[in-house]
Amino acid sequence: MSSPPSDVAALPAPPAQPVPITGRALPNGLAAFLVFFSSGAVLVLETVALRLVGPYVGVTLQVTSSVIGIALAAIAYGAWTGGWLADRRDPRGLLAPALVLAGIATAVTLPVVRYAGEVLRGGAASAILLLVALAVFVPAALLAAVTPLVVKLQLADLRRTGQVVGRLSGIGTLGGITATLLTGFVLVAALRSTVILLALALALGLVGIGLGWYLRREEPTELPGPARARAALAVLGLAGAGLSTVAPNPCDIETAYHCARVTADPSRPSGRTLLLNSAQHSYVDLADPKYLEYAYTKWIGAVGDVAAPAGQRLDALHLGGGGFTVPRYLTATRPGTDNLVFEIDGGLVELGEQELGVRPGPDLRAVVGDARMLVAGEPTDSRDLVVGDAFGHLVVPWHLATREMAADVRRVTRPGGVYVQNVIDYPPLRFIRAELATVAAEFGHVALIAPPEALAEEQGSNFLIVGSDAPLPLEAVRARLAEVDPKVSLLSGAALTDFVGQAMVLTDDYAPVDQLLATA
């Protein structure tokens, strides 16, 4: 008797599973190099991007946070996209194009940021985010796609998945660390941002082309995209590199900290203006060091003029050199004065000697280093006058704004000596109020010099804090201010107390200066 037909035999065969499109694994050394190199290139971009956008939007906490955030977003998007593509195409055909495209995008970044920066100047959050995105996102995303492509190629044995992924992830992290340290300690100090980025673009292009040649020799692989599109991209990269040489460059020189430029004053042949990150920072008259152009330097000069009898030498300490305007003024008005200048940027010291009439000698000494660290090493009761002029219009070294710093300045200042500190703030004037409260926490007598419009919160301005452990010669200061800047106001006593209100005292533990400076 025959058996009934089987239902199982009648079922259709299951569909065939798709075969992953994956080429042969790369040699371990090549795979490690590609991950190390591409990850390091992302961190070079991130580090240099801060210098690239700084002349247009400043180097504030918000700008730094934007660079880090946009770079991380690009890494996340690139890694995700690279992994998605690796499951749909042979990664061997994508690696070389990713590197070449990253090189092209890096070359194009320079002119794009410099032209866009002229339009997006300022500290608005939208301008910061857009300019940073233009500087970082596309090349960083392309480079971040390299690691998942390499990982997919190397996963030949599922039993070693954890080992392969862990090893390549570690190599990528090591590449980023190496690039960060190399860029921060060596490249930025030695080379202009233009040179660093163009060299990186060239290196990416050459590595991509070399990798493409190697992979096609080992196993013929079709490059993605039509030939015309690839040719157009090559032309775009060359055009980007060429435009970088003619795009508006806000720097004459790039120091380790600043984009610096010196311009001549057309109305005063011996006048020179120092611009740092495209903002006016200092003005000097090469022929007449007693000439003070900016209002706040006139205020400092007025306080210095009455700090001791006319012509008497002083022991002065300057926290920040810039254009060395005030040290030159004191040297001219009080012969024999010992001007000790702490300037963190050695490039500015060299620029001052070359173009701003700075003549180092027994009466003018410049020490390169961080003012906070250097003040800590100064003898107690060693200075008659301390001038704090290290704050910019968008950049404030917060560690110089705290009560601990003010206490160290008070320690260095002789009994009856004077501390003057230049601060720039904008309505609603949260930072200047906090800094006044901070200085007043250490100095028993404090006054404020500022334009009346700024005190009324109608405009941003320089503010000059004057502090001492002895009563200030307020009437003498007022009389001298009336000669050099009749419209300026001098606030002290109850009026100053009302102005400060309940402002916070800044400390090393909590000094949110960037947030206090925000105008929104």
What are these regions (language model features)?
Residues 394-401:
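Glycine/threonine-rich flexible loop motifs
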Residues 286-316, 326:
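Extracytosolic and intramembrane catalytic regions of membrane-associated proteins
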